[in-house]
Amino acid sequence: MACPCGARVLVEILTGLLSLKNQSPSTPPESEGEFTRNYILGPKYIIKAIEIFSTMPNTIPPFEYAPVKTTWLKRDVLLFAHSIGCKAGDELHFLYELHPKFQVFPTYPIVLTFKHADIDIVDFLARNAARTLPPGCPVLDWSVAVDGRRRMEFLCPLPPSSEGKTWDIHTKVLGVFDKGAGKGTVMEMEHVLKQRESGQVYTRAWESVFFKGTGGWGGERGPKMNEHVPSTPPRRPDAVSSFQSNAESAHLYRLNGDYNPLHATPEPGKSLGYGGTIMHGLFSWNITARAVLSQFGGSEGRRLRDFEAMFSSPVKPGDKLDILMWDMGLCKRATSAVRNDESLQEVRFMVKVGDRVVLSNGKALLKCEDEGVEVKL
């Protein structure tokens, strides 16, 4: 598939060369040089242009969707906290709406890109199949889509309910990349949660979606998935936490709004080579955020400023997840969610099931002090 930008240039070349300055065959050119340029070299340039532009990759330009309204209730944020394993005790303020420090777990907005304003279950595959795709993008099958990478910046704590104000998710496709025949396609997107009346941005998130086996359509290869991502240090972790999932963990988590059948019944996972049902990638991502915040942030949601990780291999219901964390000390301002006068603590992490890495290249940034809470070093 030729590059759309190249096609436009090719049209301009053809138009210019074939117009021959609007001369008819009976009108002689003004000079011998002009005759050579128009009638002899012109066709050669056309052929060369066709050769060049026919081999150029299809570059998908950025594409922005219309804002999508989203809503949530206190019940939704309580359900989310329960689904990622928050416990009564040090995390009761995420689980009980009358707690004096009741707050929304900071990564909750990640599920709003699925939930929108729904109050009931929706057909995940039908909704995504109805998406408008960027010009030049091939048709993508969401039944073969899995998470590649997620990152979120936290600019303002979310209120316990959306009631009384209007909230929108602004989604932009940053690029669509062809990883090769038999491999797959990667779509990079950005999601911004904004309060409409004030214009205040609350969170900004980035995701890479990998569509298995859909490559070879002539698109740009794009960057490697592991370029410019943090790595874990070659030493023993400073903290380790474990989470034991069960057969119903995915069924509970999906009630947050992600109703992909891949995480509810064995058949889709078997057809994709996973052997059965797999957990939501964001389930592992969110329980890891909870572990990092508990270990290094005193379970204080406002401390979390930035969180990211790559999805390396699937997790199955019943797997035990071991979360390995490294304290990297203080770091400089590296995110728009942080004020210039704030100090940040950086934590690197990975997650394993046995010896297999399931989350890699993880990094969290936490505010060092918040209302007298000491940093756990």
Swiss-Prot record:
Alphabetical GO biological process terms: fatty acid beta-oxidation
Tagged with keyword ATP-binding: no
Pfam families: MaoC_dehydratas, MFE-2_hydrat-2_N
Protein name, UniProt field: Probable dehydratase NIT22
GO molecular-function terms, A-Z: 17-beta-hydroxysteroid dehydrogenase (NAD+) activity; 3-hydroxyacyl-CoA dehydrogenase activity; enoyl-CoA hydratase activity
Keyword presence, Oxidoreductase: yes
Induction, per UniProt: Expression is induced during iron deprivation.
Organism: Ajellomyces capsulatus (Darling's disease fungus)
Enzyme Commission (EC) number: 1.-.-.-
Task of the protein: Probable dehydratase; part of the gene cluster that mediates the biosynthesis of hydroxamate-containing siderophores that play a critical role in virulence via intracellular iron acquisition during macrophage infection.
A GO CC term attached to the entry: peroxisome
Leader sequence segment: none
Metabolic or biological pathway: Siderophore biosynthesis
InterPro entries: HotDog_dom_sf, MaoC-like_dom, MFE-2_N
Catalytic class of the enzyme: oxidoreductase
Coiled coil ranges: none
Binding positions (NADP(+)): 101, 196, 265, 287
Region of interest (Disordered), residue spans: 220-243
Domain called MaoC-like: residue spans: 233-332
Keywords on record: NADP, Oxidoreductase
